[in-house]
């Protein structure tokens, strides 16, 4: 089994990328430089191939301890098969990083330069400075927004050995053979579960953007304490509200500050907010229309993307804004590109303006979030989409989608049964955009999962 190592200076996002690959939090992530001191290792699966992923200690020369970590890390690199060199796209590349990257180039191992924290167009422009590394393979990513990760995975996938067991192939063949034309077999819970449960809606945002005022307006009573003092809400506040015979459970989460200011009880509250979002269906991402949008707003919105939630962007304090709505909407679309599927509504929580529209939006998005798309319609769509825009070849070989079926709800998860499971991220984006034009998917993410047909050889 091949070994893939993540390497770079402290605080460039190695541990966050490690956690993103693994799918759960194993490595501790922090803004404190050098949080990872020992290497973390685990077996992961990229599409249908397995590898050992290694999160190295940060390379820094600021202390004796880090000198020991550096020596250990360099030893790990020599024993690995694939190297991901991570840099921070928010800062100009350093000479030390360039020297280190060039030294790894001499190892004759697959080496990629991964530029993290590319969260905006300004960051993309700055990333051109990294051309100086002379990297053959270079990727711009945003771990916090889950942007560009699939492209890195596809690059790694091509370098891994085929190690699919006979049992794995047989199990997937059994799974496909049990799907009827309507795609009846789905993961864990069927649609009746979602019809009968309350819709859980998390209210998230920076401190003092009006989350508690919004909760009070939505449930029509003073359930949460409202104050001009930032960070009044520490404990989550739950309140049920029935609309059109459907129970909606609103949760007002603790306001989130910049990481450097989080300590003690607020750190506990932040952790609890993330655990709450794991259980939510929809997030109301609250922005303050009277202030410029910040990087912290982006990071908080990234939580909604991280937990694959339905999203409504709520532009609060609209009565205090003098800007044109269309212009503000464009700013939001540019800044929160990773939530392009989320509808935007302007409200005044304290004044109660346009609050009533949020209930209908929640019900609409929840229906989209939990819907089942007929397999026959999915396959008709795939046939038309691939005919209009053929799938790019992989290493000169044709890539085909044999069959598509929905295998999960909340959000919709679509299995694409293929001869080769390397689906470029840009083509995946194309399919998702086309799906949004053909199906009712407003406000919900869509997850496409390439799967290899058991016991089939790659077709030419």
Curated annotation (Swiss-Prot):
Keywords: GTP-binding, Nucleotide-binding, Repeat, Ribosome biogenesis
Gene3D superfamilies in the record: 3.30.300.20, P-loop containing nucleotide triphosphate hydrolases
An MF annotation (GO) of this entry: GTP binding
Domain EngA-type G residues, every copy: 2-164, 199-370
Annotated residues for binding of GTP 1: 8-15, 55-59, 116-119
Lineage: Bacteria, Pseudomonadati, Campylobacterota, Epsilonproteobacteria, Campylobacterales
Gene: der
Domain of life according to the entry: Bacteria
Family, similarity comment: Belongs to the TRAFAC class TrmE-Era-EngA-EngB-Septin-like GTPase superfamily. EngA (Der) GTPase family.
Assembly behavior: Associates with the 50S ribosomal subunit.
Positions of GTP 2 binding: 205-212, 252-256, 316-319
HAMAP family assigned to the protein according to its UniProt record, in alphabetical order: GTPase_Der
Database matches in PANTHER family: GTPASE DER
KH-like domain boundaries: 371-454
PROSITE patterns: G_ENGA
Name of the protein in question: GTPase Der
Annotated GO biological process: ribosome biogenesis
CDD domains assigned: EngA2
Species for this entry: Campylobacter hominis (strain ATCC BAA-381 / DSM 21671 / CCUG 45161 / LMG 19568 / NCTC 13146 / CH001A)
Chain's role: GTPase that plays an essential role in the late steps of ribosome biogenesis.
């Amino acid at each position: 089994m091949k070994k893939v190592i993540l390497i770079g200076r402290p605080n460039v996002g190695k541990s966050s990328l490690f956690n993103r690959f693994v799918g759960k939090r194993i490595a501790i992530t922090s803004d404190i430089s050098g949080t990872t001191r020992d290497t973390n290792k685990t077996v992961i699966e990229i599409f249908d191939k397995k590898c050992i992923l290694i999160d190295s200690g940060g390379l820094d020369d600021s202390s004796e301890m880090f000198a020991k970590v550096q020596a250990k890390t360099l030893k790990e690199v020599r024993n690995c098969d694939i190297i991901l060199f991570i840099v921070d796209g928010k800062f100009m590349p350093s000479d030390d990083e360039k020297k280190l990257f060039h030294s790894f180039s001499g190892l004759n191992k697959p080496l990629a330069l991964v530029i993290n924290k590319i969260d905006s167009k300004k960051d993309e422009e700055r990333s051109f400075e990294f051309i100086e590394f002379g990297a053959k393979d270079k990727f711009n990513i945003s771990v916090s927004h889950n942007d560009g990760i699939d492209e890195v995975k596809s690059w790694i996938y091509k370098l891994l050995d085929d190690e699919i067991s006979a049992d794995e192939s047989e199990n997937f063949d059994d799974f496909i053979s049990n799907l009827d034309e309507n795609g009846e077999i789905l993961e864990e819970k069927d649609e009746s579960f979602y019809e009968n449960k309350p819709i859980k809606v998390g209210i998230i945002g920076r401190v003092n953007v009006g989350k508690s005022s919004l909760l009070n307006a939505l449930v029509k009573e003073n359930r949460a304490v409202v104050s001009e003092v930032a960070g009044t809400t520490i404990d989550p506040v739950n309140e049920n509200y029935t609309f059109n015979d459907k129970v909606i459970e609103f949760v007002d989460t603790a306001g989130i500050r910049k990481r450097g200011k989080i300590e003690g009880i607020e750190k506990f509250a932040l952790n609890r907010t993330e655990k709450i979002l794991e259980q939510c269906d929809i997030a109301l991402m609250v922005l303050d229309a009277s202030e410029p949008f910040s990087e912290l707003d982006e990071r908080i919105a990234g939580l909604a993307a991280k937990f694959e939630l339905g999203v409504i962007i709520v532009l609060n304090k609209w009565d205090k804004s003098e800007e044109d709505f269309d212009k503000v909407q464009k700013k939001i679309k540019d800044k929160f590109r990773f939530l392009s599927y989320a509808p935007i509504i302007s409200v005044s929580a304290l004044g109660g303006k346009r609050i009533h529209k949020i209930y209908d939006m929640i019900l609409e998005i929840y229906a989209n979030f939990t819907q089942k798309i007929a397999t026959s319609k999915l396959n008709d769509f795939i046939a038309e989409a691939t005919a209009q825009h053929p799938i790019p070849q992989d290493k000169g070989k044709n890539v085909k989608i044999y069959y598509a079926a929905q295998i999960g709800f909340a959000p919709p998860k679509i299995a694409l049964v293929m001869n080769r499971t390397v689906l470029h991220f840009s083509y995946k984006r194309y399919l998702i955009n086309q799906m949004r034009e053909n199906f009712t998917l407003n406000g919900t993410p869509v997850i496409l999962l390439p799967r290899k047909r058991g016991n089939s050889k790659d077709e030419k």
